[in-house]
UniProtKB/Swiss-Prot annotation:
NCBIfam families: autotrans_barl. This is Serine protease pic autotransporter. The signal peptide, cleaved at the inner membrane, guides the autotransporter protein to the periplasmic space. Then, insertion of the C-terminal translocator domain in the outer membrane forms a hydrophilic pore for the translocation of the passenger domain to the bacterial cell surface, with subsequent cleavage. Disulfide bonds: none annotated. Cleaved to release the mature protein from the outer membrane. Keywords: Cell outer membrane, Hydrolase, Membrane, Periplasm, Protease, Secreted, Serine protease, Signal, Transmembrane, Transmembrane beta strand, Virulence, Zymogen. The lineage of its organism: Bacteria, Pseudomonadati, Pseudomonadota, Gammaproteobacteria, Enterobacterales. The active site is at H127 (charge relay system), D155 (charge relay system), S258 (charge relay system). The record marks N1094, N1095 as: Cleavage. It comes from Escherichia coli O6:H1 (strain CFT073 / ATCC 700928 / UPEC).
């Protein structure tokens, strides 16, 4: 490339053109040439590279940052983005990029003069004759041109590179080439974008130009209009900067943009393609650009010329032998009699190396010599194994493994050379010993499975670099490569740990594309012991100005004094004159470090490394898969920042004794005038997600900062957790590939979507602290720790526990708890804060809540406008103290359905609600709270004083111990509510209203704690209100308490300057409904007795159908019954036994023993519960030859009962009972035929059922209920009809029957007692009709099986259905 140029006047164009001063008579030739390409009289000028001259010209009313971001795919312009808005500097919409998804410009070289169109080829204009190398992506790579491939007649060339490019994906090439008018087809080509570099200008609407930067400082890009001419050349007028036809971001290419690409979106192929390279422009004040369309035929031929003949392996023959002569640069691959000639590097000519393509399944190659293939690469169409004789190596441009192939590579490389790998297929590294070469991979999978040599040494590569976002490297084991020599370049790739334990002491990751993962079933362990730093430190030496100047503190400078070069380290940002006043002697400005250059450089380098060792570590990449990650204590207390992402669904990330920060990532922008790509004060950040099973913190400081969401449980041991932290770090070199330069600061998001989010359960131990300043969903368990809330969006969805731990909702915070909470301390609420205690929303329902319990030591409302809300199925306990004007809401005026409880805790909470929407148990003190109740229950836990009380359809009661309560209210407004007070006939609970009382339809109920004497007058004041209060505000209410309906007798006294409601006495009567429920509960034992009775004689009945001998048997029965009052039960009954046959004169006597187990449950309007019964007995059955029989049985049963009553405050009771049974049955089997019989029966069962007594309190009233032992006597008469069916070796007896079962004695008496007296409920008799049908079958000579179905009807208690199956084995 000519770097010496000048501006010359051209008489043909009438303007200046740029020419090389090394060219011969260029001016005359150029002027003539331009006469053939004038458009609308505008001169065209060649665009020479890299002449520092005019270049991209863009609109001045759009921020220059937009054009910079566009060119580098940064900011809004990420590849694939759609409908991108473009605004001017005033915030007005200029237009939208809505004709195509955003293009990916990564294939454009870093300097903008060439574009990668194949892994080894770029395109540009041939008059760019001086550049010798290109780089891509973040520019941290260099590829040399080995052949320029200049077109003979067109200003175009397609240089070949020395290696396969791994960092980026080549651009797709237009399929239409130079076809006439191809790119004027707006239906197929919907958008045209360009990118280039050079001297930068902006233009206003008046055409005034302002220089922005010198040539090749950076790239800009933008839109161009549909071509005016489209053939071998594309011509358009992007210099008409404000013409809408050029799109919202017009960019006019000028000198310095030579060779830069023009892309078009091919709607037909749904992709962007490169169509041309920029050749000329019409002058700085012109408008027209000329592009040379890609000559696709020429390009294809150029690439084809670099291939040797393809090699086709023949299966079944020996491997291909590869020999190579380094001197001649040629080699031979031979298989049998067939040979293929190949060409490699000759002397220093890399381009002499040709590409080889291999095909043939399961191919094999053996290198007989070391091969130096130069710029030639290997491409495998099929799977191959490539090996080498001892010590033989291969170098070249790289390897391509096509999709679906697996190439096993057993050849080591050369130190200082990298093996470049592309292609979607797999490359398995399987050599031996230490491979000194490196790996750069840009696509597909590389499996590192190097084998150890005889000395045990193994190394697959000296270094590994992943780039482009496409490749995966799989570690065969942890020894394959030094992890610290693994790096991720532009857009990165995946490192698969493959179940291994790997330790990194440094992470070299350029961007978010860097991924460490584990896809193996065996969990990997990743240790990030980040101690080491990049030792590649550059120490530039600046010159000291004798007149003073500015510089960078810490940098090295030199000055020649007295013929000797002296070296200094600058200590300040500026320094003074060194001629007089000599600032070099000022230690605040300079530090002298000697005259030895090497020692001075080393001093600075050591200080830089020492500083880096203390710097925080930031990882921009991703941690994913099946692994645990551990960050141990790092030297110097180094902080670790993750602004990439973590996805470890079954993994644990552990941090020990350090600072760990999860944060979002600032959107990277292109640099303008030296600006950093990111900053602390920028508004646009990318969200990042962190998912893991557990985050484990020990002695750590953890921050979840803006734009980060964490989904994980957290285990904290003596650690500090900040959710919603404003602490962030930005990398001033983010996206550049340069060494990380971190800047710490604060950043507060402006929108809700930019705030951090947490979901999970946190456990705090050993003085841990949790500060919640952002959205929180989950649970908290705190032990000897502290929790502070400032976020307005904290949702506790799991039960909360705070033991020895504080919970504070600070100013503006809002805590919503949905699943219960326990705290042994007070919960604090600050100014404008809110605490909401609610039931648990039922999934997939609109407005259902399961009850929940909140048990705390209290609530302190310390800030003005603090709010405590107890609602939708919540029962809260704990005193409330309002030291500031605050609000307490209990219940809700919005209907909410309380769902049936699915857990014990929820059932308990539901019982405490007593049918109300919400409930509170405790005192409210301080006198400053405004309390409102809607469909709510407040149980006064102590004397209370509040400012205002609004009550709607609610109840306020005073229950608990025998201490009387006083409720003092400044203003009371109550409607449709109950006020329940207590009295011991001397004193009582009281309500005092000091300022105003209003309302109506309220009932005043009074519970007495001992029986009042007959006719006793009490005269006890209950409610005191200001004079003038309506006497109709309270009416005496009737309350069902215990087994009675109690109504106080009141009178209203308006004397003494106030209005009082005074208790005179009581009127009590029995509550028949409660008594009936109690009787039903107490009679559950009778129903259990009947269950056993119905199964008592089943075994003896079977004997009459078996004609068997001694044997063992088993039976299982299942049934369900029902009775009045919503009663229903079901049971499963198991019997096992053994009996023996005694043959006597005219009679067969069977005697046996049985054991039984019954599991039953019952439910009714009054109660629900379960009984487990275990018993045993003896039985005998006499079968007479005449057909008569007698059955006898005695049995004992023990019952273990758990029942919950929903009447009179009974609650759950666990108790044991027992019962005895003595049964006798007789009957006669008449045979109508040999197979058919009829059998009349009579049975009598006498039993004993133990009694039970329960004592408890309903409020302050003592209650008891009792039934004594009783002895049922039950008779049954009936008839059965049966028939036996038999064959050669089988028989089946089928039977059906009906009978009448009846009680001969009344059931036991129930005695109920409460404060109003004793009530006796006499036992009753019951009877029912029984129906049964069944069969008994002989399976083998000594085995029988029986099945029977039963049902009853017409009784107060009936068996709805029952089935029993039995099995007998006879000896």
């Amino acid at each position: 490339m000519n770097k010496v140029y000048s501006l010359k006047y051209c008489p043909v164009t009438g303007g200046l053109i740029v020419v090389s001063e090394l060219a011969s008579r260029v001016i005359k030739k150029t002027c003539r040439r331009l006469t053939h390409i004038l458009l609308a009289g505008i001169p065209a000028v060649y665009l020479y590279y890299p002449q520092i001259s005019q270049a991209g010209i863009v609109r001045s009313d759009i921020a220059y940052q937009i054009y910079r971001d566009f060119a580098e795919n940064k900011g809004l312009f990420v590849p694939g983005a759609t409908d991108i808005p473009v605004y001017d500097k005033d915030g007005k919409l200029v237009g939208r990029l809505d004709k195509a998804p955003m293009a990916d410009f990564s294939s454009v070289s870093s300097n903008g003069v060439a574009t990668l169109v194949s892994p080894q080829y770029i395109v540009s204009v041939k008059h760019n004759g001086g550049y010798q190398s290109v780089s891509f992506g973040n520019g941290k790579n260099t590829y040399s041109l080995v052949d320029r491939n200049n077109h003979s007649s067109v200003d175009f060339h397609a240089p070949r590179l020395n290696k396969l490019v791994t960092e980026v994906i080549p651009s797709a090439i237009t399929s239409e080439g130079t076809k006439a008018n191809a790119y004027k087809d707006t239906e197929r080509y919907t958008a045209f974008y360009r990118v280039g570099s050079g001297t930068q200008y902006t233009k206003d609407k008046d055409g005034n130009l302002v220089k922005v930067a010198g040539g090749y400082a950076f790239k800009t890009g933008g839109t161009t209009g549909v071509p005016l001419i489209s053939d071998a050349t594309i011509v358009s007028n992007p210099g008409q900067t404000y013409n809408p036809v050029n799109g919202p971001l017009p960019d006019y290419g000028a000198p310095g943009d030579s060779g830069s690409p023009l892309f078009a979106y091919d709607e037909q192929q749904k992709k962007w393609v490169i169509v041309a390279v920029l050749r000329a422009y019409a002058g700085i004040n012109g408008a027209t650009n000329w592009w040379n369309v890609i000559p696709t035929d020429y390009l294809n031929q150029v690439m084809q010329d670099d291939f040797d003949a393809p090699v086709d392996f023949v299966s079944g023959l020996p491997p291909l032998n590869w020999t190579y002569d380094k001197t001649s640069g040629t080699g031979t691959l031979s298989q049998g009699s067939k040979n293929w000639t190949m060409h490699g590097q000759k002397d220093n000519d890399l381009n002499a190396g040709k590409n080889l393509v291999f095909s043939g399944q399961n191919g094999a190659i053996v290198l007989k010599d070391s091969v130096t293939q130069g710029a030639g690469y290997l491409e495998f169409k099929d799977s191959y194994t490539v090996s080498a004789e001892s010590g033989k190596t291969w170098t070249g441009a790289g390897i391509i493994t096509d999709k679906g192939t697996n190439v096993t590579w057993k050849v080591n490389g050369v130190a200082g050379d990298n093996l470049h790998k592309l292609g979607e297929g797999t490359l398995t590294i399987n050599g031996t010993g230490v491979n000194p070469g490196g790996l750069k991979t840009g696509d597909g999978t590389v499996v590192l499975n190097q084998q150890a040599d005889t000395a045990g040494n193994v190394q697959a590569f000296s270094s590994v670099n992943l780039a482009s976002g496409r490749p995966t490297v799989v570690l065969g084991d942890a020894r394959q490569v030094n992890p610290d020599n693994i790096s991720w370049g532009y857009r990165g790739g995946k490192l698969d740990l493959n179940g291994n334990a790997v330790t990194f002491t440094r992470l070299q990751a350029a961007d978010y594309g860097a991924v460490i993962t584990n896809n193996a079933q065996q969990k990997s362990r990743l240790l990030l012991d980040l101690k080491a730093q990049d030792t590649n430190v550059s120490v530039p030496i600046g010159s000291i100005s004798p007149f003073g100047g500015t510089g960078t503190p810490g940098n090295l400078y030199s000055m020649i004094l007295n013929g000797q070069t002296r070296f200094y380290i600058l200590k300040s940002a500026s320094y003074g004159n060194t001629l007089w006043g000599n600032s070099l002697n000022d230690p605040a400005q300079w530090e002298f470090v000697g005259t030895d250059k090497n020692k001075a450089v080393q001093t600075v380098k050591d200080r830089i490394l020492a500083g880096r060792a203390k710097q925080p570590v930031i990882f921009h990449g991703q941690l994913t898969g099946n692994m645990d990650v551990t960050i141990p204590q790092l030297p110097g207390g180094r902080k670790v920042i993750l602004d990439g992402s973590v996805n470890l669904p079954e993994g644990t990330l552990s941090e020990d004794s350090g600072t760990l920060i999860f944060q979002g990532h600032p959107v990277i922008h292109a640099s303008v005038s030296g600006s950093a790509p990111v900053s602390l004060n920028q508004k646009d950040w990318e969200n990042r997600q962190f998912i893991m099973k557990t985050l484990s913190l020990k002695d750590a400081d953890f921050h979840l900062s803006r734009n980060a969401s964490l989904n994980s449980d957290i285990k904290s041991d003596n650690s500090h957790i900040t959710l919603g932290s404003d602490r962030v770090f930005v990398d001033k070199n983010d996206g550049t590939g340069n060494y990380v330069i971190l800047e710490e600061g604060t950043s507060v998001p402006d929108t809700v979507n930019d705030r951090s989010q947490y979901e999970g359960n946190i456990t705090l131990d050993h003085n841990s602290t949790l500060d919640i300043g952002s959205r929180f969903t989950g649970g908290i368990e705190a032990y000897d720790s502290a929790v502070s809330i400032t976020s307005p969006d904290v949702l506790l969805t799991a039960p909360g526990a705070f033991a020895g731990s504080s919970l504070t909702v600070h100013d503006g915070g809002h805590l919503t708890a949905l699943n219960g909470l326990f705290s042994d301390g007070h919960i604090q609420a600050g100014k404008n804060s809110k605490i909401t205690l609610s039931g648990t929303p039922v999934k997939d329902t609109a407005n259902q809540y399961a009850p929940a319990v909140y048990l705390t030591d209290g609530y302190d409302l310390t800030g003005d406008n603090a709010t405590l809300e107890i609602t939708r199925g919540a029962h809260a306990s704990g005193d409330i103290h309002a030291s500031a004007a605050s609000t307490v809401t209990i219940g809700s005026d919005t209907p909410a359905e309380l769902a049936s409880a699915e857990t014990t805790a929820s059932a308990f909470a539901g019982s405490l609600l007593e049918g109300y929407n919400a409930a509170f148990n405790g005192a409210i003190t301080g006198g400053r709270a405004d309390v409102s109740m809607h469909n709510a229950l407040w149980t006064l836990g102590g004397d209370s004083a509040i400012h205002t009380l609004t009550v709607r359809n609610s109840r306020i009661s005073s229950e608990g111990d025998r201490t009387f309560r006083t409720l003092t209210v400044n203003k009371l407004d109550a409607t449709g509510s109950d006020f329940v007070l207590r009295t011991d006939l001397k004193n009582a609970d009281k309500i005092n209203v000091t300022e105003k009382a209003t309302g109506s339809d309220n009932s005043l109920n009074v519970s007495f704690m001992k029986d009042p004497a007959q006719g006793q007058s009490l005269n006890i004041p209950l409610v005191t209100a200001p004079a003038g209060t309506s006497a109709e505000m309270f009416k005496a209410g009737t309350r069902m308490i215990g087994f009675s309906r109690v109504t106080p007798t009141l009178h209203v006294d308006t004397s003494g300057g106030n209005t009082k409601w005074i208790l005179d006495g009581f009127k009590a009567e029995a509550d028949k409904a409660a008594a009936a429920k109690a009787d039903s509960f107490m009679n559950a034992g009778y129903k259990n007795f009947m269950t056993e009775v119905n199964n008592l004689n089943k075994r003896m009945g079977d004997l009459r159908d078996t004609n068997g001998d001694a044997g063992a048997w088993a039976r299982i029965m299942s049934g369900a019954g029902s009775a009045d009052g919503g009663y229903s039960d079901n049971y499963t009954h198991v019997q096992v036994g053994f009996d023996k046959k005694h043959e006597l004169d005219g009679v067969d006597l069977f005697t046996g023993v049985t054991m039984t187990y019954t599991d039953s449950s019952a439910d009714s309007h009054a109660f629900s519960g379960k009984t487990k019964s275990v018993g045993g007995g003896l039985y005998a059955s006499a079968l007479f030859e005449s057909g008569a029989y007698i059955d006898l049985i005695g049995k004992y049963i023990h019952h273990d009962n758990d029942y919950t009553g929903n009447f009179a405050g009974l609650g759950t009771k666990h108790y044991n009972t027992h019962s005895w049974y003595a049964g006798a049955e007789t009957g006669y089997r008449y045979h109508l035929t040999e197979e058919t019989f009829i059998e009349p029966q009579a049975e009598l069962v006498y039993g004993a059922v133990s009694g039970k007594t329960f004592r408890w309190k309903d409020g302050d009233m003592d209650l008891s209920m009792k039934n004594r032992d009783f002895s049922p006597l039950i008779g049954r008469t009936g008839i059965e009809l049966g028939k036996t069916f038999s064959g050669k070796d089988w028989s089946v007896t089928a039977r059906a029957g009906t009978s009448w079962q009846f009680d001969l004695l009344n059931n036991g008496e129930t005695v109920l007692r409460d404060a109003s007296g004793e009530k006796r409920i006499k036992g009753e008799k019951d009877s029912r009709m029984l129906f049964n049908v069944g069969m008994n079958a002989q399976i083998k000579d000594n085995m029988r099986f029986g099945l029977e179905f039963e049902k009853s009807a017409f009784g107060k208690y009936n068996v709805d259905n029952a089935v029993n199956a039995n099995f007998r084995y006879m000896f």
